[in-house]
C-alpha cells in the first residue's frame, strides 16, 4: 500500500526520528529527509533540465533557489517614463506613475513603457541634463521638467484655484495653496506652537528662533532668513522696481507692496473684526488685531519681562535693549529699528503721500494719519474725558485736555 503511494521511494522507518532520512533513491541509494529535495534529485537521473536564469544562464536544482537567485540579480531593464525620465523596475509601478501625467493632460494617449538603455541610465547617474531652456539656458534631465520651467517665461498658469481664482504654473503649487482655504495647518513649530499649511513656511519661520540667516547680500553683507527677502533687498542696490500700478503708474520693488498700494485706489477693506467692527485691508492685520480683544501676549522679553502678542513685535522691542538699528536712510544717515519706520521716514525726503482721503482728496504719508483724518468726516470721537464727558477724535487731544482737570 505504501509503495503504491510512493513508487520511486523506499520507506525506511514507519516513524522516523527528527532529521532522519526517509526517502531513498532507487538509482544511487542516496537518502533525503524532505520530499521536494528527493524529487529534484530524481531529475539528475531522468535527464530533465533544471530551471535556468534567462539573465545569466545559471542553473538551479530547485525552483525556489532560482527565485532567490533572480531576486539577488540587478535588473537589466527598467521602465523609463518618456515624460519626466523617472525609471521603474516594475511595470505596475510605472503604469501608476504614468497616471500623474495623463491626469494633467487627459487628451494625450498613454505612453508605452520604454526600456531604459545603458546610455539613458548613465545619463541620469552622471547628472547629464540634455534638455536646456532656450530663454535662460537652465538644463533639466527630463523633458517634462523643462516644459514646467518654460511656463515661468511664458507666464502660463493652467492650474486655477476654484476658491479664489488664483492660478499657478504647476499642479503641486495649487495643491499647497488650497491648504489656505481648507484651514489645514499640519506643520507646527515646537518653539512657539505656531502652525503652517506648508512645510517650507515652517522651516523659514524656525529661523526666527534659531537666528539663522543663510541668504547674504554680496553688496552690503546684510543677511536674510529667506531668499525672497534677499532678492527684494537687492533691488535697493539696483533700483529695480518691476511692479507697476496700472492706475497711477507708481512702481514698486516688491509685489506685496504693489498689492497693498492698489487697495488705496479701490478702497478695499474686506476683513472685518467680529468683536468691534474694525475693518482691515489684509487678513494678517485682522489676525494681529484680534489679540487686542483676547489680551493674549505669549512672547515675553527676557530683559525686562514685557510681553507681546506677536513675535515680530518682540524682535523689534529687543532692539531697544541692544541698540540695534539695522535700517539706515541713505540720504541723511538716520537709522531705525524697524523697516516700516524707515519707509515712512523716506517719504519726508521724497514727498510721497500715498494715502488719499476719498472724501476731500487730502493725502498723507502714513495710513494711521489718514485714519485720524477720516474722523473729521465721520464725526467719530472715541476718546472721552471721565471728568467732564467731553470727547475727542485723537488720543493726544484727550491727554492734553485732561491736564485742565489736574491743575
Curated annotation (Swiss-Prot):
Stored SUPFAM superfamilies:
beta-beta-alpha zinc fingers (SSF57667)
Q: Where are the zinc fingers (C2H2-type)?
A: 23-45, 51-73, 79-101, 131-153, 159-181, 187-209, 215-237, 243-265, 271-293, 299-321, 327-349, 355-377, 383-405
Q: Give the Basic and acidic residues compositional bias ranges.
A: 39-51, 100-111
Q: Which GO terms describe its molecular function?
A: DNA binding; zinc ion binding
Manganese as a keyword of this entry, yes or no, is: no
Q: Where is the composition biased (Polar residues)?
A: 115-124
Q: Which UniProt keywords apply?
A: Activator, Developmental protein, DNA-binding, Metal-binding, Nucleus, Repeat, Transcription, Transcription regulation, Zinc, Zinc-finger
Under SMART domains, the record lists: ZnF_C2H2
GO CC terms for this protein? cytosol; nucleoplasm
Instruction: Say yes or no: keyword Chloroplast present.
Output: no
Q: How does it assemble?
A: Binds DNA. Interacts with GATA4.
Tell me the protein family, please: Belongs to the krueppel C2H2-type zinc-finger protein family.
Q: What does this protein do?
A: Transcription factor that acts as a cardiac regulator and an effector of alpha1-adrenergic signaling. Binds to PE response elements (PERE) present in the promoter of genes such as ANF/NPPA and acts as a direct transcriptional activator of NPPA. Also acts as a cofactor with GATA4, a key cardiac regulator.
This protein is called what?
Zinc finger protein 260
Q: Which organism encodes this protein?
A: Mus musculus
